[in-house]
Amino acid sequence: MDFFISLFSDPVGFWNSHTLLISQIGINGILATSMFLVLYSGQLSLAAPGFMAIGAYVSVLMDLYWHTPYVLNVVVAVLLAGVVGFLVGLPVLRLRGVFLAIATIGFVEALRLGVILNLPITGEGLGLKNPNADPLGGVPVILVSLVVIAFLVWRLTKGRLGNAWSAIRQDEIASLSQGIFVARYKMVAFVLSALLAGYAGALDAHLNFFVDQGSYDVARSVQILTFAVLGGTGFVLGPIVGATIVTLLPYVFQGIGDYINVISGIFLIAVIVFRPQGIVGRGGLALVRPSWWPRARAVSAPQTG
């Protein structure tokens, strides 16, 4: 309750005292949009934490060892995440559904256990210190980035690319028969998703004085997927709303300790039961109604002439 009182009674004070929370909402919103892209194109990929780790570690390492400008660090980190996304996508995008999910989880764990935990340059299991972090200075960049990314992705879904993704999601075989280059369009979605996850990782790393491999594991994959399931994948704002809710829950109910996990689970189950398409439908926010509740049938206009 104190959380909402502070929000509405003193917005400026709330902003100043919850800067890290606002930043995390923005980061999670970008990750949720990354997940939206692959789900919208019919791919159950859980690779986002791997690309996020690439963005985080590359940007911080460039800053530590080469002292290059922040913008250059982020650009290089994002591009490298995209290149790795393309290379990973070549074999794994031949898979579908659960098999694709398992393969991308394998990529995340292979990167974390096989690379990050075994290279001295990444701090091995001890993590990586980031003395040049700026926890308070990145909020405007993060929020503006989220708005711009959401708008651009929304525009993509309304164009030729979005139509192809939608067709592939509904019926991949039928899409092939219609002349749609399924492999190409799936790769585009996968690489764009990798770029966004890498960007989120680079932004997130420069908010923290310590980069830890534990932030890029399978649990993070499940969390990002939860953003999409909770908010809905029919509209780009859905996963962002889901990310906002999941990020806020621990702060809103911080006085109840470990029971927050129980409340979060109950809330997620309730949404799945009463709003299986997510909080945000294809056309935006809608009334919560059980999936079995009768819906009014559309009445067609009488034909004339």
Which stretches of residues belong to each language-model region?
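Transmembrane alpha-helices and adjacent helix-loop boundaries
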Residues: 1-305
